[in-house]
From Swiss-Prot:
It comes from Arabidopsis thaliana (Mouse-ear cress). This is Transcription factor MYB115. The gene is MYB115. Residues 181-204, 232-255 bind DNA. The lineage of its organism: Eukaryota, Viridiplantae, Streptophyta, Embryophyta, Tracheophyta. It is found in: Nucleus. Disruption phenotype: Single and myb118 myb115 double mutants do not show apparent developmental abnormalities. The endosperm oil of double mutant myb115 myb118 lacks omega-7 fatty acids. The keyword Transcription regulation applies. Induction: Induced by LEC2 but repressed by MYB118. Residues 153-208, 209-259 form the HTH myb-type domain.
Length: 359
């Protein structure tokens, strides 16, 4: 059943297309070959989408040879969600009649408002090109970060020095001196100025001593250590041919040797001929004794403070906080003053009277 009289602007399907110009003279529609709708069961009649308004808005020509777009329902996927409006445009100025269960549907909404409503109601899928560009940018950033980290790791080489590097360092020091280590490090791959300086002063200097330590050197080390402590740079200045690193390594090696002997329960406290070992042993014993005294002092002070706090609380509250003791309350002394009344005498001190609010 058709209810064409309900909407006057809805054209009749059986009417002549030329009559549409009379009903809507401003938006005239030129006749063209009809293409069946994609959903013929809904009874929606297709009409060309080449009116004057759309020609102005979408730059669509009225040439009959140009492909036209017809009013067809939006494609519906299996989940019941409409696609976006990429392939079909709604001819909002040309009404159509959908004979679905006797209903008449008219399209008179502006194109812009209709597009905004549709975009808000449904999830419009994002273009794949934009996703590809975003993914490519993230991949590029990851590659740049990986290359940057890789370069930072390659800046400082932690490997051992090779004989070739030692020879090159000796030649560069002879030509540039011992003050411009940054410039010297540029000649090495994966080395910095600090590494070149330490390598030169600790291993490659011509006047450096690599032989065993003598008793005179140990005695100088002991005397200077008594004054400056573990300042190896100051000690190395008093020992010609011994670098800061060599002095520190000699000290630590002697300590490890004493520790290993003590671990093996050998005669660790027997007198030694080495003066440095005896000195380090005495320092270790004195440090341990001093540490024990400090610990004992801290423990004693804490116990004194705890006892003092308990005494203060006992004096104020007349209570002993120790769990094994009980509160002592003096017994009442009963004195009889006659057969009519009895008077109780109860000895108490000032603290007990104060706690009970007695005057």
């Amino acid at each position: 059943m058709y209810h064409q009289n309900l909407i006057s602007s809805t054209p009749n399907q059986n009417s002549n297309p030329h009559d549409w110009d009379i009903q809507n003279p401003l938006f005239s529609i030129h006749p063209s070959a009809e293409i069946p709708s994609k959903y013929p069961f809904m009874g929606i009649t297709s009409c060309p989408n080449t009116n004057v308004f759309e020609e102005f808005q979408y730059k669509i020509t009225n040439d009959q040879n140009f492909p036209t777009t017809y009013n067809t329902p939006f494609p519906v996927i299996s989940e019941g969600i409409s696609y976006n409006m990429h392939d079909v445009q709604e001819n909002t100025m040309c009404g159509y009649t959908a004979h679905n269960q006797g209903l008449i549907i008219g399209c008179h909404e502006p194109v812009l408002v209709h597009a905004v409503v549709e975009s808000q109601q449904f999830n419009v899928p994002q273009s794949e090109d934009i996703n590809l560009v975003s993914q490519s940018e993230r991949v590029t950033e990851d590659k740049v970060m990986f290359k940057t980290d890789h370069k930072k790791k390659d800046i400082i080489g932690k490997g051992q020095w090779t004989p070739t590097e030692d020879e090159l360092l000796v030649r560069m020091v002879k030509s540039k001196g011992t003050k411009n280590w940054t410039s010297i490090a540029k000649m090495f791959q994966g080395r910095v100025g600090k590494q070149c300086r330490e390598r030169w002063h600790n291993h490659l200097r011509p006047n450096i001593k690599k032989n065993d330590w003598s008793e005179e050197e140990d005695q100088i080390l002991i005397e200077v250590h008594k004054i400056v402590g573990n300042k190896w740079t100051e000690i190395a200045k008093r020992l010609p041919g011994r670098s800061e690193n060599i002095v520190k390594n000699h000290w630590n090696a002697t300590k490890r040797r004493l520790h290993s002997v003590r671990t093996k329960r050998s005669d660790a406290f027997s007198p030694r001929n080495n003066a440095l070992e005896n000195y380090i042993r005495s320092i270790t014993i004195n440090n341990n004794a001093l540490m024990n005294r400090e610990v004992d002092s801290i423990t004693a002070n804490s116990e004194i403070d705890s006892t003092r706090c308990e005494n203060i609380v006992d004096e104020v509250m007349n209570l002993n906080l120790h769990a094994t003791t009980s509160v002592y309350v003096p017994e009442q002394a009963v004195l009889t003053w006659g057969y009519d009344f009895t008077k109780c005498y109860e000895p108490m001190d000032d603290t007990w009277m104060l706690m009970n609010g007695w005057n």
